[in-house]
């Protein structure tokens, strides 16, 4: 029986991906890697309590058929995972075939740090602690192939302000795969501009915060098409737009350095 190796790492802005490579000489195993990533938010830390990750092979929409993966459960600060950084959550071998869904189950120890103060972040949807957050995958895993998947946890949209010093967590998450998306990378200067970078196409928008030292940014999970890249400056620096950036599946589109001026 062919087996599939499933790896579940952790990342910071954008979704889900599949990459094919040899896994053994006999090509009897396949590997699925799942990463957690985060869209930027204006916080010092966003601590998410990850309890379980499960997968489902059947197309049944009921609550049966879920298989729990061996996961390095714990509290992860999403803001530590950006511009390509990640951490492995799980590794498992499974029979080759179709995976229809993935489920992420969160715990109750979620917090944010804002201006040096820590605030509890209760889940607005309690089912995220019981039935979990479900994602449709519909991946046909083949022996000898490697599959990578990203889950994009959007911090800014996931945190709901309910009072002067009270917040709730309402997870806004998307998934993407390398095989079905591209990426945009570049650099924004100067660091003093503290810019946020947006990729915009029609009503769709994705974002990233450049590295505070180098100014480098990477936006993953970008659908194929033509995008405008906007560097939104702060501290008196003017915005700048790079129009017509072409994105193709499985490739990284590189934007020339964007220099903002006061």
Question: Where are the regions that the model predicts?
Answer:
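Hydrophobic alpha-helical membrane-embedded or membrane-associated segments
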Residues: 10-13
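Bacterial N-terminal signal peptides that target proteins for export
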Residues: 1-8
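C-terminal motif of bacterial Sec signal peptides marking the signal peptidase cleavage site
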Residues: 18-22
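A short, solvent-exposed, low-complexity linear motif enriched for acidic/polar residues
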Residues: 24-244, 249, 255-262
